[in-house]
Every structure is written in C-alpha cells, then in structure tokens.
C-alpha cells in the first residue's frame, strides 16, 4: 500500500494482511503471484480478512541462482554445527583435508573408522580379540577415538565392518579348487589361497581369495592384513584371469579402504593445547545437483566455535540467521531432494531456509516448487542424513498455506 508499506493478499474479494510473501506465493500456485501498488483510499471499502503467514518461514524465497550449494558440518564438544551458503569463504573456514579418522558415537561404546576416499564409516569389531591395533597400523590409537554426535556420524554410510578372519573361517579350506575359470583350474590351487594378478613388469595389479572350488573374491591390502594364518600366495599373469568374475564373501569387504589409509587417522589427542586442537568436519558441495561431492576435513576448534556464534561468518549481505545448530546465509537456502541412497524410494523434497529450518514441500512438491519459482531439476539430490541435521519447520505447500488462513 502506497505511503504505509502495508501488504495485502486479495482472495475471493477479501484483503488479507501479509506476514510473509512466501505464504502469498503458495496461495496462488497456478497464476503466479503478481504485485500492484494501490493507495489506502482505493482499498478503503474492501473487506479485510485474517492475516496470512505460515510461521517460521522466510519472508520470501531465493531465486534459483541464489540457492546454496556448499555445506560444512563440524562436530564440536558442544555438539555439531552446520554452515550452509552459496559459497563458504576460505578465510573464514580454514579447513584441511583429512585422510581418515577414528571416532566413537556419543553415548555408545562402538568405534568406527571413517575413510575420506570411500566416504564411509566402518564399524571396528572389537568382539574378536585378534583385532589388535597392529593389524591396521592403528598402533594404540584405537583407545583414543574422537567422540562425535550420532547425527554427524550418520553423514557417512556404513561399510563392511572391519574384523579379522582366518583360514579356518573358509569352508573346505585346503581342498583343491578344480573348477576355477580358464587355466587356473590346472595350477594346483587350493581353497583359501590368495592369487596375485601380475602384469608383464611383475607388478601386482589385483589380488583374489579362492573362496570355494570355482570362485574368487576381490582381495585388497586391508583384507590381506586382516587375514590370519593365510597360506603362501601364488602369482599368475594377467591373461589367466580374463574369465574371472569375482563374487563376494561375507567376511571380506570389497569396499574396505586400502591399508595405507589406516596409517595416520585423526584421533583424540588430549595433549594438544587449545590453540592447536582441531574438529572433524564433513563437507558437501551440491554444484552438481545429481552427484554431490563429499569430503572429510578438519578445522581449528577455536575458529569453528567462533563461526558457530559469528553472525557475519558467511559474509552474506543480509547476515545469516542462526538457530540451535545451523547457520544459513541470509537471503539464501537449500532446495533438496532427500534420498536414502538405497534406491527404490521416492525422494522427499524440502527447503532449508535462512531461518535455519527444514521445510517439507508437501505431498505434491512439484506444485509447491512451481509456486515458489523453482523446478525439481534445481533440487540437489543428497542423502537424507544431511537434511536431518536441520530441525523441521513449517510445511511450505499450497495446502498448508490455505489451511493456515482458513481459505478453501
């Protein structure tokens, strides 16, 4: 309204005061929201209705090119904190890439190895006494894991648990493997043996475990380190493996990291002073909406604590708003399609607003996105655990908007 700045939404001959433009957009999903200026006099005799405005939603939503694409979630002593922005300034977030980490979920005795390259967490099975620190070059570090919140640990999907296994765990170990593919069956190979595939220069390209009389299992350097009482391995040229189609064994992880990743994990070093302590962080970049990139990094603890309270830490024009555990750049937000990662499940579409809430887009998200100026192709497909870092807020859908003001 000219002269006053008041805003109204017209519906069915009634003017409704507008608490936020977002709700008004959702109330006109088909026609798109149009704005006109009018004088107070011209609106004098038009009936007034209830104020419209879903609670805890942004006044307006960002255009597609202002949607956030960078996430950083750090686990600190006080709990995890997540920063979301179109860009995270390197000066304010001085992160350093980590190879791996030894962690323990808060409130649990379970320990995990988190590997950056694999992007997974691996349960360390301590129920078997043979799993000594020496097996994977932990030395004594397994006794000093970094305690993290379960929600933060859930950002890393689970891999095959790490546990030692023995020659005697293999059924029929030592028996001839007479049905192996190709010429391998004529080499006197027995079940339980490790076969190395070597190139013309004598370099080992792949290793396999003979799991039964006809099948091989992929066998990497970590599997070799965890294999107890193994018989001597045999080497064969690459051409002898051309008919091999590896299978899986329940006690050997084909997703295990290489043994080199275990040499220098991040761990809890209580001898560090406050100035040198770091925190573990997970990083996500959704520039490619279909294939986000993930990373494991560390950041100085002092800076992480400062950034969790610093309203200007993202250098955003409006200044971000903060809630319990998230800082979202003001005027931005993240449009997400949350998935379980397992396939066969429809994505859940949500919007993370600069108020620090995760808003469902309702039962028909395409209609909600259309009303707000977005399309499904602009939503980043990310694991559900990332969305669940953010506390839920009001649903942002035409149905929720109409219900909030009693408009049918």
Label for each model-derived stretch:
Residues 1-408:
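Short, surface-exposed polybasic-aromatic patches that bind anionic ligands, especially phosphate groups
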């Amino acid at each position: 309204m000219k002269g006053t700045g008041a805003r109204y939404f017209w519906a069915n001959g009634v003017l409704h005061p507008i608490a936020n433009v977002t709700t008004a957009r959702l109330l006109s999903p088909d026609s798109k929201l149009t704005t006109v200026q009018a004088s107070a006099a011209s609106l004098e005799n038009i009936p007034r209705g209830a104020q419209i405005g879903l609670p805890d939603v942004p006044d307006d939503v960002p255009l597609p090119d202002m949607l956030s694409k960078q996430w950083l979630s750090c686990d600190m002593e006080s709990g995890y904190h997540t920063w979301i922005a179109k860009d995270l300034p390197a000066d304010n977030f001085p992160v350093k890439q980590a190879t791996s980490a030894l962690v323990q979920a808060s409130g649990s005795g379970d320990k995990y190895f988190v590997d950056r390259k694999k992007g997974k967490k691996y349960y360390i099975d301590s129920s078997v006494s043979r799993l000594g620190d020496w097996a994977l070059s932990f030395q004594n570090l397994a006794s000093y894991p970094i305690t993290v919140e379960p929600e933060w640990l859930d950002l890393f999907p689970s891999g095959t648990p790490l546990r030692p296994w023995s020659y005697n765990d293999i059924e029929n170990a030592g028996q001839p493997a007479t049905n192996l593919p190709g010429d391998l069956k004529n080499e006197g190979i027995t079940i339980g043996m490790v076969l190395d595939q070597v190139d013309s220069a004598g370099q080992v390209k792949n290793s396999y475990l003979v799991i039964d009389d006809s099948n091989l299992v992929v066998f990497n350097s970590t599997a070799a380190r965890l294999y107890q009482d193994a018989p001597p391995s045999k080497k064969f040229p690459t051409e002898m493996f051309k008919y091999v189609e590896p299978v899986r064994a329940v006690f050997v992880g084909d997703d295990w990291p290489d043994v080199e990743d275990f040499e220098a994990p991040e761990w809890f070093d209580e001898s560090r002073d406050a100035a040198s302590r770091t925190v573990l962080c997970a990083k996500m970049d959704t520039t490619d909406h279909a294939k986000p990139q993930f990373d494991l990094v560390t950041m100085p603890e002092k800076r992480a604590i400062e950034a969790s309270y610093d309203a200007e830490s993202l250098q955003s024009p409006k200044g971000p708003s903060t809630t319990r555990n998230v800082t979202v750049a003001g005027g931005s937000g993240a449009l997400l399609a949350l998935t379980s990662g397992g396939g066969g499940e429809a994505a859940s579409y949500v919007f993370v607003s600069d108020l620090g809430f995760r808003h469902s887009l309702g039962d028909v998200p395409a209609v909600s996105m259309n009303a707000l100026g977005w399309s499904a192709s602009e939503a980043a497909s990310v694991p559900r655990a990332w969305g669940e870092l953010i506390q839920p807020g009001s649903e942002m859908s035409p149905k929720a908007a109409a219900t909030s003001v009693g408009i049918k």
